[in-house]
């Protein structure tokens, strides 16, 4: 490297006290409008352009376009206003969703809930349906009634589990069966022994009864002689 080139380069660097003599320290605080940061950035760009043009031989036209970047900072107030407006809009939308306007107490007929039969209140005057038992269940209950007309609680639980019925159903069935049994036996006539007939039984008259009492021999079978 020639000494002429080195001396010429050093003379350019030593011409000023610093490479960026007019650059000011930018403030870190951003005001509500954002203009402080934009003005500091604009000043730094203007001071930075002539210093570099002497070293790197860059035309000033390139650095004249630097303020394009500062135009965004100059609109800081509008940007903040736009951001706040979007936030306010979202907040208003959220409030309107969370706090709907009071409407009528009665909903339209097409939006009413569907009522199922099991959701309605039971009518006390309505009669319940009669419980039907299968043939196998009836046969087992009849067999149990033939041996025991009254069941203990333990036996009732066993039969209920065996026949897949409830204790209440077993209890009601036995109550009805006992009432039927009493009714059938109450209406049956008293049967007489098979060897006797109604015609063989003759009523004793009052005229013949004193003769048997007054004649002791005939009464006890005593014969004379």
Swiss-Prot record:
Region listing for Disordered, in residue ranges: 183-225
Name of the protein described by the UniProt record: Homeobox protein Hox-A7
Lineage: Eukaryota, Metazoa, Chordata, Craniata, Vertebrata
Keywords assigned: Developmental protein, DNA-binding, Homeobox, Nucleus, Transcription, Transcription regulation
Span of the annotated motif Antp-type hexapeptide: 115-120
An example molecular function term from Gene Ontology annotations: DNA-binding transcription factor activity, RNA polymerase II-specific
Main subcellular location: nucleus
Keyword hit for Transcription regulation: yes
DNA-binding residues: 126-185
